[in-house]
Amino acid sequence: MLKKLKNFILFSSIFSPIAFAISCSNTGVVKQEDVSVSQGQWDKSITFGVSEAWLNKKKGGEKVNKEVINTFLENFKKEFNKLKNANDKTKNFDDVDFKVTPIQDFTVLLNNLSTDNPELDFGINASGKLVEFLKNNPGIITPALETTTNSFVFDKEKDKFYVDGTDSDPLVKIAKEINKIFVETPYASWTDENHKWNGNVYQSVYDPTVQANFYRGMIWIKGNDETLAKIKKAWNDKDWNTFRNFGILHGKDNSFSKFKLEETILKNHFQNKFTTLNEDRSAHPNAYKQKSADTLGTLDDFHIAFSEEGSFAWTHNKSATKPFETKANEKMEALIVTNPIPYDVGVFRKSVNQLEQNLIVQTFINLAKNKQDTYGPLLGYNGYKKIDNFQKEIVEVYEKAIK
């Protein structure tokens, strides 16, 4: 579930004892028995960066997420200090308190962590933005935690990438499975009971027994039967000019799930007939509009849209905005999903000591395992994993997704 990208910085599986650490080079592993920390290096207070918009969201004059975050911090402090006191290397150190501070966005989070200012110790960031940041600033912050989410019932395997865009392409096959859920039983007709709406997601679309450490974007198409057939023909013929002229809705230029991942698919599929979205948009400005995919049905001149994979899963069909609504003789369907990109990554400022990092990572894992994480699941984080090798587990997967 990708709803977390809209709402927060911090939050938003295999559960094993603490036995790892990520080096400052972001590629190696430091065994716990090799790590030592002095009393002066021990932080008695740790601050997490949390989305300012989420943290300050109000309803009736009250901050609606205040209780959620307070309960989470209480649970986190209790579990962390239990682990600390059970560890011979840390049991004599002071117990640690935890608090949150508001952060505007992912870019601000990375910039603040890179200053190594103890007013901000940790946050969770989009993997793509993190990888690109570290290319220009190697070793300046320390990735240590990978988030996971309940997998979609139609997409449980990360190792599926673009092949040729035909019906046998694994990414097209996923799109066809999406259509069985979204189109064959029309989304507009879903009831809260039949599809298990819990106030945040349609639970029927997820398999909580399988944790996914990746997400994708997707390309929607819309129209009556004749228009859909023409769009598909342009796709199959690799006729970029005709395809683009059906009009494309997209997200911000820096969005991976609503711009960059789809751009990679278009490059691979249309090859030398396509350059970049920005170049093509400059040449054909009327064919593009920055707007949410769930509004595609309301726009007569646009028939293609980019979105997060399965965004309807966390979009209530009874919303006043009437998401994904189309004209009576038209429908929306998935054309193809994108390559997978790693889910979000937890990052420490450089000087947080290694033992404390280890304990924080294990605390995240334990809270999820014991159903005591009152914060993450509301926004799409259902589990956590330690990162043993940032280069292999995150960077290489990311690079493969966008090439």
Curated annotation (Swiss-Prot):
Lipid-acceptor residues (N-palmitoyl cysteine): 24
Cysteine-cysteine disulfides: none
Membrane topology recorded in Swiss-Prot or TrEMBL: Lipid-anchor
The entry's keywords: Cell membrane, Lipoprotein, Membrane, Palmitate, Signal, Transport
Alphabetical GO biological process terms: regulation of cell migration; regulation of protein phosphorylation
Covalent lipid adducts (S-diacylglycerol cysteine), residues: 24
Classification via InterPro entries: CypI, CypI_dom_I, CypI_dom_II
PROSITE patterns (alphabetical): PROKAR_LIPOPROTEIN
Localisation per UniProt entry: Cell membrane
GO cellular component: host cell cytoplasm; plasma membrane
Signal peptide (from-to): 1-23
Main location: membrane
Family annotation (Pfam families): CypI (PF06646)
Function as written in the Swiss-Prot or TrEMBL entry: P37 is part of a high-affinity transport system.
Protein name per its UniProtKB record: High affinity transport system protein p37
Organism name: Mesomycoplasma hyorhinis (Mycoplasma hyorhinis)
Lineage: Bacteria, Bacillati, Mycoplasmatota, Mycoplasmoidales, Metamycoplasmataceae
